[in-house]
């Protein structure tokens, strides 16, 4: 299961005339029964929401007041995500005859009073923003939005935006839907929102949400795989200048090439672009080649030594579950047998985490021949290699257990000889010989039925962090 969270707007999406229909509530229960979470993201003031929605506990969390308030309906805990409006601001609105209501943080009025609101903000020199929701006008602290509220909720739930399906109908839903892994507009959505959505339902509000849940979400959106494959990362430029890209949820990868031909650079480019797009990456590093990735925000390098944190799978699980942290596991301080055993432990832990949260999104194993040698493929037993987002990196593909090597459906190679000779002999990629690759060049090879369906030569994009080889300990 990839999509673990449904994040939905209230008015005009889940609710019609202020209420959620019984059939829609039943559909939300089916989402929760599937093991997924449900998040409400609404512009309504919290007190008002609790009045009109007695079934509030159907949600795991609530983002209210357009991102300004985070509410746990089970613990009844409220967290303000911004500062309340000043007395001077409220007095200024009243003086201009603006009808308004206040929540914990939000100030709400209606069109056409946005002009008086803006005049008051300017006259007092306040750092406030105006947000429109059809005929409603909301005033919030700068930087507060449904998107910022979504981020706070995801941190609390320990989930990633990429494992979230969002659904809404109005202008103020745009920012938060853009941050989800799949954006849905109900049929009654404003045209601008519908134009940017991945899917527009055929029926409005709650009926549209039911259509999404029963027709797509409970099947993990498998019918929309072509749309999901459009999310790509750049790898470099082809000879004719066009950008060579790889689908983030494409086939599992094998990155290969002789020593010194740039396969670590190519791997680093892949990882850096995944990190830039907020994907959670788990990289097993038997030789300590990727320590410099610690320069990236949101990634932790765990050092290796017998009994260190890098050999305790529980430490990695804790980081991933609670902080959505990308991790490099540096195993260079272990001997080969210890590396194989540590790999088995880590993959077992990561499999559990993927089942629970969908993350880490990518699992990369460098020097795969060290930890998956022929006859020792059991290091990967219990790990679902069929899940997209697996990358094996090795200069010796012939020294990787065949049952592990078989998971790759795409090859990136920095050495034409490795492809035309070693992989061809293994029956993995029947690629004809060609002009040797120059420095910084690579091949992108789509596999199918033991042959290459497509071969593309490209120049690898530069890395943003340096590669510093470290001597292997085993």
Residue ranges of model-derived segments:
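Asp-based phosphoryl-transfer active-site loop
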Residues: 2-18, 177
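P-loop NTPase catalytic phosphate-binding loop
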Residues: 229-362, 372-399, 403-412, 474
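Mg2+-dependent phosphoryl-transfer enzymes with acidic/Ser/Thr/Gly-rich catalytic loops
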Residues: 1-2, 21, 140, 147-229
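Conserved acidic, metal-coordinating active-site core of Asp-based
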Residues: 86-179, 188
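Conserved ATP-driven motor cores of ASCE-family P-loop NTPases powering translocation/secretion/packaging/pilus
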Residues: 389, 394-450
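Conserved P-loop NTPase motor module
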Residues: 233-234, 240, 256, 437-474
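Active-site phosphate-binding/coordination module
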Residues: 17-105
């Amino acid at each position: 299961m990839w999509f673990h969270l449904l994040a939905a707007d209230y008015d005009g999406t889940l609710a019609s005339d202020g209420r959620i229909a019984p059939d829609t509530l039943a559909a939300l229960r089916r989402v929760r029964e599937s093991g997924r979470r449900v998040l409400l993201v609404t512009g309504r003031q919290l007190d008002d929401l609790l009045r009109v929605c007695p079934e509030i506990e159907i949600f795991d969390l609530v983002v209210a007041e357009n991102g300004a308030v985070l509410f746990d309906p089970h613990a009844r805990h409220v967290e303000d995500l911004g500062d309340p409006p000043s007395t001077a601001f409220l007095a200024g609105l009243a003086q201009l005859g603006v009808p308004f209501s206040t929540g914990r943080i939000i100030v709400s009025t209606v069109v056409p009073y946005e002009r008086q609101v803006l005049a008051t903000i300017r006259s007092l020199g306040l750092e406030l923003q105006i947000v429109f929701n059809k005929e409603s006008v909301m005033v919030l602290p700068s930087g507060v939005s449904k998107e910022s509220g979504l981020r706070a909720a995801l941190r609390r739930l320990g989930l990633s935006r990429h494992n979230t399906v969002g659904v809404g109908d109005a202008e103020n839903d745009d920012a938060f839907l853009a941050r989800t892994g799949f954006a849905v507009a109900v049929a009654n959505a404003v045209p601008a929102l519908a134009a940017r959505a991945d899917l527009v339902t055929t029926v409005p509000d709650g009926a549209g949400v039911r259509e999404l849940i029963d027709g797509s979400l409970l099947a993990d959106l498998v019918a929309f795989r072509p749309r999901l494959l459009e999310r790509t990362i750049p790898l470099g430029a082809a000879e004719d200048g066009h950008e060579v890209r790889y689908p983030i949820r494409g086939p599992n990868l094998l990155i290969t090439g002789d020593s010194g031909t740039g396969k670590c650079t190519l791997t680093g480019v892949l990882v850096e672009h995944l990190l830039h797009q907020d994907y959670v990456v788990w990289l097993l590093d038997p030789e300590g080649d990727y320590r410099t990735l610690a320069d990236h925000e949101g990634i932790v390098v765990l050092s290796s030594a017998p009994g260190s944190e890098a050999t305790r799978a529980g430490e990695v699980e804790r980081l991933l579950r609670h902080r959505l942290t990308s991790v490099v596991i540096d195993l260079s301080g272990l001997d080969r047998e210890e590396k194989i055993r540590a790999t088995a432990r880590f993959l077992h832990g990561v499999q559990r985490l993927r089942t629970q949260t969908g993350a880490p999104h990518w699992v990369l194993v460098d020097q795969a021949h060290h930890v998956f040698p022929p006859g020792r493929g059991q290091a990967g037993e219990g790990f679902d290699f069929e899940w997209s987002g697996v990358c094996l990196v090795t200069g010796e593909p012939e020294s990787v257990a065949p049952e592990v090597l078989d998971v790759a459906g795409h090859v990136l190679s920095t050495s034409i000889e490795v492809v035309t000779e070693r992989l061809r002999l293994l029956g993995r990629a029947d690629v004809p010989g060609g002009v040797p690759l120059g420095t910084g060049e690579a091949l992108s090879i789509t596999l199918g039925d033991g042959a290459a369906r497509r071969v593309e030569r490209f120049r690898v994009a530069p890395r943003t962090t340096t590669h510093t080889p470290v001597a292997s300990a085993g």
